[in-house]
Every structure is written in C-alpha cells, then in structure tokens.
Design a protein with these regions (language model features):
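ABC ATPase NBD coupling module
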Residues: 43-47, 101-118, 147-148
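Conserved ABC ATPase "signature" region
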Residues: 16, 33-42, 97-100, 141, ...
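Hydrophobic anchor residue at the start of the ABC signature
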Residues: 184
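Helix-to-loop junction immediately C-terminal to a conserved catalytic motif
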Residues: 84
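Conserved ABC ATPase signature
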Residues: 170-174, 178-180
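Signature (C-motif/LSGGQ) region and adjacent switch/coupling loops
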Residues: 105, 133, 146, 159, ...
C-alpha cells in the first residue's frame, strides 16, 4: 500500500496501473488472451514463457510513497521498467498524471523521462574519468544548461545527497553507497 507523506492528496493519481502484465516469450500475448487474465505461471512456463508481472493494479497519489518489495526475480524491476516504458507490458494500462503511457509517442516519452520521472538502476554507470561534481553536472549540460548553472545545481545536489567534501572524488574513490547517491543526484 502506498504510504502518505505530509503533502496534500490530489484526486487524480500521479501513477495508475490497471491489470498490468508482462510475460516474456513468443506466444505471451496469445496465451494471455486465452487465459482471460488468470495466469498460472507453471502453464506459461511449460509453453516457454516467463511471467514477469502478473495482474498488477495500484494507484499512487501526490505525496504518497510506494515501496515495491519481493524476492529476487519476483518482477520488481520488470514492473518499474514497464511503468517507465523501458519495457512494454504485454497487457494492461498505465496512466501518468492521467496520460496513457502506452499511447505516448517517443518524443512524449523522452519529455516525460527528462522532466517527470527517473530510474536509478542497480548497476549504475558513472563516468570514471569525471569527478562526482562533473558526473552530476554532465546530464544537465547535455540537456542544455550552461556550465555555470549546471555546476551550481550539481553542488546543490552534492549537498542534498550528503556528499559534501567529495565533489572532486572520482567514482573509484567512493563506496558503492556513495556511488549510488551520485547516480541519484
């Protein structure tokens, strides 16, 4: 269940997933249609398919936090990849602020990912030849910010993620948790 944080709740969910399925395999769509939404993982596995997400439905409103927990291989990352459209779901509906994510053009998806959502991967790719500050400023510069503005914003992010004093460190000089914070910043 999403948890309420101190913020006003809007009536429209920020994220809404309805009957979301992601099944990997050649016959996934056909099998899902034939199953009428009742997915038995063993039956799908016997047909050469792997069930990644099985009928996920939830809403997240402004100010809420959602924790997705499960065992290794249970589909947590697959669900998040579907929500960000890094992977297309086999079936279901995903709305972001009321907009149908599955109907968005590539241009709309790029805009959404740049301005409204992000994903921190388990294995993050920091540029090894750039410092903490440069790694944080780089995407801002790619997006069109001036060097001066991107450095200022990057310094603010360094403070926000608790890496003050490590701005000039290279990724190899940071712990795994510190590298993760650079990726988040």
């Amino acid at each position: 269940m999403p948890s309420q944080v101190d913020a006003p709740q809007s009536k429209q969910p920020v994220i809404q997933c309805n009957s979301l399925y992601k099944i990997f395999g050649e016959n996934a769509k056909r099998m899902l249609q034939n199953s009428k939404g009742v997915v038995d993982a063993k039956t799908f596995q016997d047909a050469g398919c792997v069930v990644g997400v099985n009928n996920a439905s939830f809403e997240v409103h402004q100010g809420e936090l959602l924790v997705i927990m499960g065992l290794s291989g249970s589909g947590k990352s697959t669900l998040l990849r579907c929500i960000s459209r890094l992977t297309d779901p086999t079936s279901g509906k995903i709305l972001i602020e009321g907009q149908d994510l599955l109907a968005m053009t590539n241009k709309q998806l790029i805009d959404l990912r740049r301005n409204k959502m992000g994903m921190v991967f388990q294995s993050f790719a920091l540029l090894p030849h750039k410092t903490v500050l440069e790694n944080i400023a780089f995407p801002l510069q790619v997006k069109g910010s001036s060097t001066q503005d991107s450095i200022k914003r990057a310094k603010d992010m360094v403070d926000l993620v608790g890496l003050d004093g490590r701005e000039n460190y290279f990724p190899r000089e940071l712990s795994g948790g510190q590298q993760q914070r650079v990726g988040i910043a």
